[in-house]
Regions:
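Conserved beta-strand elements of the Class I
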Residues: 129-130, 163
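Conserved short alpha-helix immediately C-terminal to the canonical SAM/SAH-binding motif I
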Residues: 192-196, 234, 261
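A short glycine-rich, Lys/Arg-flanked "PGG" loop and its adjoining helix->strand segment in the class I
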Residues: 236-251
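N-terminal auxiliary segments of SAM/dcSAM-dependent transferases
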Residues: 2-124
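Conserved SAM/SAH cofactor-binding pocket of Class I
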Residues: 135-219
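A short acidic, Gly/Pro-enriched loop at the edge of an enzyme's catalytic core
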Residues: 218-226
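Active-site capping/gating segments
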Residues: 257-292
Length: 292
């Protein structure tokens, strides 16, 4: 299937906004491209994990009304003018190559590196995750993923069973395996995410450690650690289910939450967890709690 690639020039100040607007306009995927071959290290909380010169690229179906997309972007950005943009047709195999060319290694905490497969890890002795996002994206560039990865780096789940709820590309579950988890169950509502998780687990030689399921197919005993990087609304709705999935004295890590949503997300968890805000990056927060 052919695609249309809409590319917009961006600065670190507006790249995240453009990414969100492209998603809202119907982009099947959005990537952030380094325009100057600059290595990207995961910065401290509160700073933006973007290159100095960034291109924001949205992938649209070939029959998309691109002028309507551009008009929507301009309306949302006003009074700021629409950035310089380019539109190119792209075959499936070209998109995969473009993604791999533009996704650069990133470091999280003291030990974790996320690298595209086929790329020589900058620190071979570190804990390196080789990642191809496939159709279910999650690469560490978004603050919510970055905060979860740093939490895992600081609290390695050695010999623990872990649930990665909303596994996407499998990045958090694979990181947990690499950091010593005994077993990880990835759960996602999107079958493509399950495929991406299993493919990425194979690339990282942890396929024996992680298995992915649709929610209806998942049955498990309570685990010592549950990770969920999804959205505030589903997190609130899932609080009773998560309380059953986490063992007494076990831990839960939640992200995908805007700062102003933190209190409303914590509220349904307080009946079963001692939960608090543990990190904030830009407008996003990460919550962590212990099961009573």
């Amino acid at each position: 299937m052919p695609w249309l690639q809409l590319e917009l020039e961006a600065s670190p100040d507006n790249a995240e906004q453009l990414s969100e607007l492209l998603h809202a306009a119907g982009a099947g995927a959005v990537t952030l491209q380094d325009a100057a071959d600059q290595p990207l290290f995961e910065p401290p909380p509160g700073t933006t994990p973007l290159w100095n010169t960034t291109r924001v690229i949205g992938l649209f179906a070939a029959d998309t009304d691109i002028p309507a997309v551009l008009a929507c972007l301009q309306q949302q950005l006003a009074p700021v003018p629409l950035p310089i943009w380019h539109l190119n047709p792209l075959e499936d195999r070209d998109w995969v190559r473009a993604w791999m060319d533009n996704f650069q290694p990133m470091r999280f905490g003291e030990r974790l590196w996320i690298c595209p497969s086929g790329f020589t890890p900058p620190e071979p002795q570190a804990i390196n995750i080789l990642l191809d996002p496939g159709l279910a994206f999650g690469t560490g560039t978004h603050p919510t993923t970055a905060m979860c990865l740093r939490w895992l780096d600081a609290h390695p789940p050695r010999d623990l069973a872990v649930i990665d709820y909303g596994c996407g590309s499998g990045i958090l579950g694979i990181a947990a395996c690499k950091l010593g988890a005994h077993h990880v169950s990835g759960i996602d509502t999107d079958p493509q995410a399950l495929l991406a998780t299993h493919d990425n687990a194979d690339k990282n030689q942890v396929s024996d450690c992680i298995k992915a399921y649709l929610p209806a197919d998942f049955r498990a005993e309570p685990v010592p650690l549950l990770l969920a990087n999804i959205l505030a609304g589903p997190l609130q709705s899932l609080a009773p289910r998560f309380a059953k999935l986490v063992a007494p004295a076990g831990h839960i890590v939640l992200s995908g939450i805007l700062a102003e949503q933190a209190d409303s997300v914590m509220q349904p968890y307080q009946a079963a967890f001692d939960i608090q805000l543990v990190a904030q990056q830009e407008e996003w927060v990460c919550l962590a709690g212990q099961r009573r």
